[in-house]
Amino acid sequence: MFNKDASPRMNPVNPDDALLQRRKILQLAGASTLLCCVASSDLSAADALPKAGINAGDLLVTTRDDTGTPLKASDIKLGGKPLLVYPFDIDTKKPRSESRLNKLLLVRVDPKDLSEEARARSVDGVLAFSAVCTHQGCDVTEWKASEKTLLCFCHSSQYNPVNNGAVAVGPASRALPSCSLAEKDGVLVLASGISAKPGV
């Protein structure tokens, strides 16, 4: 025969205790979500500020160069694809920072097409801009020869290098930040830091 006393007893659940338990779980979930958001925003902020920046006097090396060979104006071809470069610290003999926000692009245009202001920032038609698109932060890597514009493939924003990196075709709404160039001992040197914060 079935013995009622042998069966496990169920304690009735107090609705107030259950509500308190749910609140604790939700508070813990909320706290952990907040902690994750704060941690990821700290990481984004750290990435947004390159450790050593882009400084006047820096040499320029390609992003593929492990030897630290400084670039000359003649290394950038007229009407060719932009060359992606990093600022190179002559004291440490290393790129200042390989943060993507430190990446610059060099492009060469016909000096006759440049305004006086742009010509003053260039060396033999070579201009330097941030390589980070101001729309969503993708790399600007292409040259659209038919339009003579720099092109970001992510959302097809185009920038006019002859017009100080102004937006030629959106969705980007802000010009590419730029740097002035000079020539020293036959190689390209940054004559200024970056004109505005790179990226979005």
Predicted regions and their residues:
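N-terminal secretory signal peptides
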Residues: M1-L20
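N-terminal twin-arginine translocation
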Residues: L19-K24, T33-I54
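N-terminal pre-ligand scaffold of iron-sulfur
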Residues: A46-V132, D139-E142, E183-V200
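Cys/His-clustered metal-coordination modules, chiefly Zn-binding fingers
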Residues: V126-I194
